[in-house]
């Protein structure tokens, strides 16, 4: 049973470096579509902007790690051209899980939960998670998170 996320920051940093390490800035006006993301990267010599919100309940102890994960994820959007809509996020979650296996099965499942799992939650509730830690622990421990939607 998984109880915490110790060591996750180092793994996120290694994955970010291994898969592109695209420079990024944290910005409330981050792109939310593939065309906007492509334009942003083109205008800024490869730098992308990522959304800063939602870090309060993230599984990462430091918001900077959450942002680094987001930068890696958005870079994957840029590379694959998979959309920011629910089907695109679920598809990208599957794709990112497949490449995250390089850093271990647990990290790959965390990546899948962070992307596809949260997209599935949003599709079911119409809202973002209020408690990412509880959701991720239940997801990874194979709890029936669908039955506990109000918990998150």
What feature does the model see in each segment?
Residues 1-152:
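Anionic, Ser/Thr-rich low-complexity intrinsically disordered regions
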């Amino acid at each position: 049973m998984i109880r915490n996320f110790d060591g996750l920051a180092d793994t996120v940093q290694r994955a970010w470096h291994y898969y592109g390490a695209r420079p990024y800035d944290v910005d409330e006006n981050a792109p939310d579509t593939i065309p906007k993301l492509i334009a942003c990267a083109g205008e800024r010599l490869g730098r992308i902007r990522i959304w800063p919100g939602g870090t309060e309940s993230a599984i990462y102890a430091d918001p900077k790690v959450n942002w680094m994960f987001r930068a890696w994820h958005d870079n994957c959007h840029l590379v694959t051209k998979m959309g920011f809509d629910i089907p695109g996020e679920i598809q990208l979650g599957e794709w990112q899980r497949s490449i995250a296996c390089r850093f271990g099965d647990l990290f790959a499942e965390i990546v899948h939960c962070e992307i596809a799992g949260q997209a599935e939650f949003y599709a079911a509730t119409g809202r973002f998670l209020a408690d990412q830690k509880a959701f991720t622990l239940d997801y990874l421990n194979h709890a029936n998170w669908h039955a506990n939607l109000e918990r998150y």
